Amino acid sequence: MEKRVLAFDFGASSGRAIIGHFDGENIRLEEVHRFSNDPVSVNGTLYWDVLRLFFEIKQGLTKAKLAGGFDSIGIDTWGVDFGLLDEFGCLLENPIHYRDARTAGMIEEVFRTVPREELYSRTGIQFMELNTLFQLCALKKYRPHILDRADKMLFMPDLFAYMLTGRKQSEYSIATTSQMVDIKTKDWAYDILDRLGIPSGILTPIVPSGTENGMLSAEICEELGLDPVKVVSVCGHDTQSAITAVPSELDSFAFLSSGTWSLFGTEIPEPIVNNTSLSINITNEGGYGGMTGLLKNIIGLWLIQESRRQWKREGEDYSYADLERMALSAEPFKCFIDPDSPEFTPPGDIPGRVREFCRKTGQYVPQTVGEIMRCIYESLAMKYRSTFSMIKECTGRDYPDIHVIGGGTKDTLLCQMTANACNVPVKAGPIEATVLGNIAVQLLSSGDIPDIKKAREIISRSEALREYAPCDTDKWAGAYESFLKILK
């Protein structure tokens, strides 16, 4: 008998509801609802429109019912962001977007109380101003009245699950993105939070990925005409959902989850926390079955997406195919940027910032759209090579290829450049890795799939992969030396 499970996958700019049909051998995807996810700026603060997003969840549930129904629900989202509930379980305010400027300078402020080395050794998480810890410290500093009224904090996938079931809990993978989880105990680092004045009473119990989060509430079932089904706490962080779906037969593999953000790393049984991992600021994120995703967050397709939006604001509506074609026609290796330089994080004039970065670093300043796009593409590929070297240094392993998963697998130019820069084959696919990982954990939770190895085998069988062989590697190796100079 076919099993049907419903996955909600929220990205930074859109969301989908997708039914996974499992016949015991293969997983087939059926998209039933798609919607935009548009942050809203109000009086200088950037918010997520969480109530509209919950409306879209209800729309997805209704459409999935009309498409034949489903046996369970799983929700994954981006990391770090959260909602605060009062003592009556009511949302205090819309969750604030990780790109909001409120966390500027908070890392250094936290280091005055908890030194960098101590915080990393306890949490194993890459330092980024957008991490939940720094968001909460900013909230305590600038809007303490909100924190004073908070009874519970829920990360985005857990918040949506709470709206469906009424249960408050924190799924392990999404909790680790906060930089507030003790890497050894896999529980909250209560003592560190106490020293920073963060009230630990707002935290909810951490549960393993695949834990049931209760049944759809009677209210939701009555409103939408649904039968009660279970909501599963899948890997709530979309990165970890995607890692679950890496179609590798090997126990040790390199992956690049390519989307708005690029997450480059490997999966390991135990965290790696030492001077090397600290010096390169690499993250140990919790995954399914207690595994660790050793990875580096890199600004990814955001640079291309936001550049396209900027040109559209200026009256030029280029397609992604147009941008790729213009990049290919431009001269290679004329200039580079560091994609992770802070000026590239906020929305706005990315092309102008690319020019300014090149000017400041004494490089050729790109003039045309094609030159800017070539610079972005090559810089991303070079950053992947740099990160690949870091992963190999940390683990002491070599990796025969790189699995590129997620939406970026559709970008053939970036996949080829990644193979060229890293000098290993790239295996691209599945595009819907996050959704497939979400579905796989639901099927693992129900016992329909026995283990993660079998899940990956099924996904590999269900999805076609495309391979890119490296070429022009000597030219890329020479240009890499120029790229390294602008990182210093």
Each PLM stretch: what is its role?
Residues 1-93, 121, 221-231, 422-424:
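N-terminal glycine/serine-rich phosphate-binding loop of ATP-dependent small-molecule kinases
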Residues 6-7, 19, 104, 111-123, ...:
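Active-site core segments that coordinate phosphate-bearing ligands/cofactors
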Residues 11-13, 71, 76-78, 132, ...:
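Short, basic and Ser/Thr-rich N-terminal targeting/leader segments
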Residues 52-65, 185-191, 383-390:
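Short, well-ordered amphipathic alpha-helical segments that serve as non-catalytic structural scaffolds
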Residues 62-97, 126-130, 161-182, 205-208:
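Short beta-strand-loop/turn "lid" adjacent to the catalytic site in phosphate-handling enzymes
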Residues 69-77, 152, 205, 397-406:
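Short glycine-rich phosphate-binding loop at a beta-alpha junction
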Residues 76-80, 209-210, 258-261, 401-409:
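Glycine-rich beta-strand-to-loop/alpha-helix junction loops that act as flexible
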Residues 100:
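Carbohydrate-associated surface elements
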